[in-house]
Amino acid sequence: MRCANLYFGVGVDVVARDCCPAPSCQAFPFNAEPETCDAELFGAGVDICHELDDRFGRPRSQVLSQRDVPGLTRAVIPLLAARGVTALSIGANTFSASADVPPIYRWRDPASNTSVIAMQNPGGYGDRLTLTTDGSAHALHLMFNGDNAGGHSPAQVAARHAELAKRFPNARVSGATWNSYIDAITADGSAARLPEVDKEEGDTWVYGVQQDLYKTAAFRAIMRARRRCIAELGYPICGGNASAAIANSTRFALKLSEHTWGFNWGYMDEVHYTNTDLAYALANVEGFATTQNGWREQRAYVAHAVGALAAAGAADVGASRLLELTKEELAAVTRPTEPTPTAPASGWTTVDPTKRITDLPRFANVAWNATAGGIGSLTTKEQGHDYARGRGGSFGQYQYQTLTENDFWVFMNETLKVQRDVAFGKKNLTNNANVTSGFWAGTLSGMWSKKAAGGDTDEGVDSFLQRVDMDAHLHGYYGAPSRVWTLFEFSRATATVNISVTLVNKTTTRLPEAHWVDFEVAVPVTPNDDVVSGTAGTPAPPPVCDSWSLSKLGSSLCASDVSLFGSTHIHAVSDSDAEHGSVSISGRGGADAAAVTFRLTTYDAALLSLECVHSVISLHCRPLSTPLCSHADSFALLSIPMPVPFRLFTRYKTAFPNPVHKDLDKGRAAEQAYICLCNNFWTTNYPNWYPFMEGDEDAIFRFQLQLS
């Protein structure tokens, strides 16, 4: 390699005076999972770094650097470009697969026609990565230390400098900042010749965000309050650093998107798995209570963000209004009240769940799953289309999942580059607990209805309430709630359904579990390969998506347009897109094959799992002693949802949707969207059991369906 200038980067803080420039920062405060943010808060994070650059007289950083997390969403590109950030660098966790992209490339967002230079090291943080571009005399050598290892010593930096000088005898080896390298390859034109990628990549670690379900719900509540305040009073009064109090609250709120949620201690114990053993360990085994306190400290950023606003005086109009809105939003997700439909004067009337509902103003037919709850048929009057798939009648149904150690071994064999049973699996679970792999539904024990207060007008909602009781063994030995209440509110004005799911008396468990709400829809779609681009600064019309459209940080992305080894099936979606919802799918339906669209907004849970229905083994209602689906059902259960981001192979008996090395299949006649309410799959970084704080035994999750 002919290299005239080798730039030598050692990270953001540690420098050696004889070979490196003054310290410089990157364009985001920490290693985050950006999908969990909305556009306003993510942008505020970039602004914080640029304000520090300005304060210390440094050039504003052009590069966002992310380590450990294997990837991030394409939706950050227009937000970065708008703030003068021209590049990003990803150093993926050593054990995790990351998107199959070149080491350095131009990553483009087609809708906004904006792009950044992307640098990716798939096998670690980048301790010995040397980046080169065709036709350039400049190269960049990275020297990042390992996870939690701190910075290099001056002696180590000097030794690497000497090593590089020997390796590249004809090059001038010099210390570098991110900016200096990006400036160099931009100036010589090589940046313009980089290979181009325009696919979504995503975050294959994002399945952990529902391991503290209250923290995620509260974080989303805080962001909703910020958006409402900005809509009312404007960004200069309510946004970013509008005042000292709001700026301080912004910093605390941002920390809720950090990729590490407490102490990584779970791998040190491979014995105390059962609920009885966990209770003993919390009281008697060193480390358990300390680890739990670490998760509580991370959740405390919710209170800190609120407290920063409360510290402002009445003269701070923006902070005062933002505090009011934040308290209002948080109240809706904190310690929900259990419904009492049988209470005197409650207004609820008992309903026979085997009877179809045909007298709703906007819906021609609604049928229920009379065994396990949920909707079996959902046909609108205007479109004449049944949006609920109907087979098994599990639309809007709560389902509980349990797993075995073998499930995790299959996942690790298919997903990780290196076996890492400790951090990603449940080592020795088989020897220390008696667990079964399967999906479990409860028993519908009651159903009630309440007519809209406006009578036969187009005002209000017609409500239906279901109570589902969970099996005593699932509640006692595992972590299922004792019962689940699901409220369906049918608008009389539009084809809109508001749904809330309330879990009551969830058991604390370390046994692997997940809680889901199933939205199995019937919207035929047509494959489409067209890409529509805009001009710089002018968004293009949204390209036609032949799969699920995902809302992330103000952008709408297509689930079938994900890079190889990117996060195809698992996504964190936003609730900020009024037009598209959190996730939507469009196609042809009804008697005349007219255009139909299904939009789902998830307000409190962020995690979405997508699966193709054509390969699902049918769900059969069974006694609660057996799961809805288990390994014995078929040679391959391809679409039982699990927070697994992609598939490599398809011929395993497993509860996981085995990762595949291709994009989400196009043109499916129907597809499933599962919302994950809670899980404890990942032993590293996230809480290993829930609840871990008194008062969290009950939880509420709200959704809205818009059908057109």
Q: Predicted segments — roles?
A:
Residues 1-301, 455-622, 627-708:
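Catalytic-domain carbohydrate-binding cleft regions of carbohydrate-active enzymes
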Residues 243, 247, 255-503:
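Catalytic and substrate-binding regions of extracellular carbohydrate-active enzymes
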